[in-house]
Design a protein with these regions (language model features):
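Negatively charged
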Residues: 1-132
């Protein structure tokens, strides 16, 4: 298991992609993503992880990702039980600000135990590309 730092200090634009991929029991993620790097690529940041807790759910955090890639950020994860509403609302704010929706495609692809996400994952949802 990788030790999660207390802050984003030390992360650069070149090392955010897959930074925590395939980790287990990530329970000490910083409660705030304040100071996260302005990376153009957060793709697969937590892909394949299990037991993720402590993911910030504030709308503002997710809106701040701007046009950075968050493709497959949580793909193939298990036990994602955090409330998706602030995340999705933040992503919606980002997209309504002119940023492209495709940068979040497959964000939750292959995930299991998405008990709070069914309304967002439906084929008719504007968020459906995040789940396929």
């Amino acid at each position: 298991m990788k030790k999660i730092p207390d802050s984003w200090e030390g992360f650069t634009a070149s090392n955010c992609n897959s930074a925590f991929a395939n980790c287990t029991s990530l329970t000490d993620i910083p409660s705030s993503w304040e100071g996260k790097p302005s990376s153009p690529n957060y793709a697969s940041l937590f892909e394949g992880c299990t037991s993720l807790t402590g993911i910030p759910t504030a709308q503002e955090v997710w809106a701040e990702f701007g046009n950075a890639s968050i493709v497959r950020m949580f793909a193939n994860c298990t036990s994602l039980t955090m409330d998706p509403t602030p995340i999705m609302d933040g992503l919606n704010r980002r997209e309504s600000g002119g940023y492209s929706a495709h940068i979040g495609s497959q964000m939750f692809a292959g995930c299991v135990n998405l008990q709070h996400y069914s309304e967002y994952a439906s084929p008719t949802s504007v968020y459906s590309s995040y789940f396929i």
